[in-house]
Amino acid sequence: MGEKENAPFQLTFNGFLKVAFQGSRITSDAGLILVRELDERLGLEQIITEHLSDSRQGLNTQFTLADLLRQSVYSRLAGYEDLNDAARLSADPTFRLIGSPKIWDRGAALTSTLHWFETELLTREENLVGLMPVNRGVIGQA
């Protein structure tokens, strides 16, 4: 009763995506590309921007909040229990692809940046409060 019915939608894929076998550039986390496409379709980045605050300014901002949250959440989805693998995942082709375009060449965040994000930035009162509408926003779009 009163439930919103969503029409089925089709995911589109990044045109830069290539499937090839090169031993030094293999990833076991390619399934996250589908999650990233879903995240884009649901508008996660916009929802994060609306509800989480970032006090960083200028050159201190190498990664957006959305990139940091994606890397943190996606690494857990891929089975990495903590931040110990962040340095290795920074160079992983999938973790580069799921971030914003500036990460594609540079690589994802390292352990120290993710640790700061999870223990300092994300735990600020305004962001703890903001996580509730982020969750509701994503669920509401699904």
Spans of features found by a protein language model:
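Dynamic "connector" segments at or just before major functional cores
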Residues: 1-142
